[in-house]
Amino acid sequence: MSSGGLLLLLGLLTLWEILTPVSSKDRPHFCHLPHDTGPCNRNTQAFYYNPVYHTCLKFIYGGCQGNSNNFKTIDECKRTCAA
């Protein structure tokens, strides 16, 4: 790659770093997982972080398995992922 191409790449990476919100860099990786109801049928209200809308949303959790993007309260979701 030519020095001009490397300079362009460096400039684009720098611009991307500047434009990426700090909060999304510090957010735990599991906050970007889709909500997962799991295979059980307990059907309890839970909350997950939606990275597209940058907010916590309600969903019905089956009560077992699923993933870590699963919170008992909206406040817990906000403290963990939306702060």
Swiss-Prot record:
The keyword Disulfide bond applies. Belongs to the venom Kunitz-type family. Disulfide bonds join 31-81, 40-64, 56-77. Residues 1-24 form the signal peptide. One of its GO terms (molecular function) is serine-type endopeptidase inhibitor activity. It is found in: Secreted. Keywords: Disulfide bond, Protease inhibitor, Secreted, Serine protease inhibitor, Signal. Serine protease inhibitor. The record marks 41-42 as: Reactive bond for chymotrypsin. This is Kunitz-type serine protease inhibitor tigerin-3. InterPro entries: Kunitz_BPTI, Kunitz_BPTI_sf, Prtase_inh_Kunz-CS, TFPI/VKTCI-like. One of its GO terms (cellular component) is extracellular region. Expressed by the venom gland.
